[in-house]
Amino acid sequence: MRLKDHVAIVTGGGGAVGGGIATCLAQEGADIVVSDINLEAAEIRANKLKEIGRRVITVRSDITVEKDCQFLIQECLKSFGKIDILVNNAGHFGKRLGLPFTNQTEEEWDDNYNINVKGPFFLCKAVSSHMMERSFGKIINISSIAAKRDPQIVPAYAAGKNALLTLTRIVAKDLAPFNINVNAICPGMIWGEFWQRLAPLVAAGDDQFDASMDPRELFEAWVNKNAPFKREQTPEDIGNLAVFLSSKEARNITGQAIHVDGGMAM
């Protein structure tokens, strides 16, 4: 097990991608703090992780609130005594999709920025002193392929995820002297709540797709058209990369944004 005796925090751990990341880390030996604003979802995931044989706790946290982020770090230290890995996975697409930037509100942009950028900033800041004292740590920020393709139908989300990549490089440079690796993962096309909402908008904006198609069918058609590998990505794909970036094999990798997108951003 590559992560035996490691302790990892995964924010947004009650969701599909966060759950996949937490599961992969646990399968490689890490004990897990599942953090989510939805405590019930976090507890469901935690129960599954306990079946693997790991020690697991749940913490409800709103990452847009700095005190919540500090509390999350404190709860992990109280339960496990250390933090080896922080995965900033919690994110937000926005309440309204498919609008050009001219039709979006200041509130929508603030909402995206608070969750997708300020939340990871708060947590990187909160965990850094502990990791610096130990001269060890792995921080992984979950961005998106939207940061590289600049999709017009999610402008605030894409801008926020791009800002997260800049934050990743800044934090990586500051923490490198303390043997702390900081990287980002850019997931591609993963079926879930986002795509269930997005599929009709994609169909409406592309004559090659039939708007009457089932959202799942439309998603598969879009993947087939846009991904060179012509296959979707999974939460486990993201989790497997998170395991590698958390391992000693990745000790010389920092400040990078790695795509898991089937070649879509080439």
Question: Each predicted region: which residue ranges?
Answer:
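C-terminal substrate-recognition "lid" of short-chain dehydrogenase/reductases
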Residues: 2, 121, 132, 136, ...
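Canonical Rossmann dinucleotide-binding motif of NAD(H)/NADP(H)-dependent dehydrogenases/reductases
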Residues: 3-33
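Substrate-binding pocket helix/loop in short-chain dehydrogenase/reductase
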Residues: 69, 97-101, 105-110, 223
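Active-site helix of classical SDR
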Residues: 124, 160, 168
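Alpha-helical segment proximal to the catalytic Tyr-Lys
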Residues: 129, 173-174, 251
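Residue(s) in the substrate-gating loop at a strand-loop-helix junction
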Residues: 144
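Short, small/polar-rich loop/turn modules that mediate ligand/substrate recognition or access, typified
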Residues: 176, 181, 253-255
